[in-house]
Amino acid sequence: MEVKAIHRGARISAQKTRLVADQIRGLPVDKALNVLTFSPKKAAGIVKKVVLSAIANAEHNEGADIDELKIKSIYVDKAASLKRFTARAKGRGNRIEKQSCHITVTVGN
């Protein structure tokens, strides 16, 4: 049994989120939540919500036991960027891309 949860368009770059995702890949969900709770990174809070959603999906839809669940797969894909401009000298402007990502978490036995 595998249950999935997806967060689309998270307003953080995929590169920063992958650092957190790599730390919890393959861990039991209780240890993964512990790691995410004490991580100082912004991405940890976002990933924690997705993991909790996947656990809730497994409980509600499949009747799974939380103690047996572990993180089967977690991956982070790049999403659309918001294009913005910032003012520069002599009336010029530079483009800034505000990155976003899609976070997918799969939990199972």
Curated annotation (Swiss-Prot):
GO molecular function, one term: structural constituent of ribosome
GO cellular component: cytosolic large ribosomal subunit
A biological-process GO annotation: translation
Keywords: Ribonucleoprotein, Ribosomal protein, RNA-binding, rRNA-binding
Database matches in InterPro entries: Ribosomal_uL22, Ribosomal_uL22_bac/chlpt-type, Ribosomal_uL22_bac/org-type, Ribosomal_uL22_CS, Ribosomal_uL22_sf
Domain of life: Bacteria
Keyword RNA-binding on entry: yes
A matching Pfam family: Ribosomal_L22
Function, in words: This protein binds specifically to 23S rRNA; its binding is stimulated by other ribosomal proteins, e.g. L4, L17, and L20. It is important during the early stages of 50S assembly. It makes multiple contacts with different domains of the 23S rRNA in the assembled 50S subunit and ribosome. The globular domain of the protein is located near the polypeptide exit tunnel on the outside of the subunit, while an extended beta-hairpin is found that lines the wall of the exit tunnel in the center of the 70S ribosome.
PANTHER family attached to this UniProt entry: CHLOROPLAST 50S RIBOSOMAL PROTEIN L22-RELATED, LARGE RIBOSOMAL SUBUNIT PROTEIN UL22M
Quaternary context: Part of the 50S ribosomal subunit.
Family: Belongs to the universal ribosomal protein uL22 family.
Name listed for the protein in its UniProt record: Large ribosomal subunit protein uL22
Organism: Burkholderia multivorans (strain ATCC 17616 / 249)
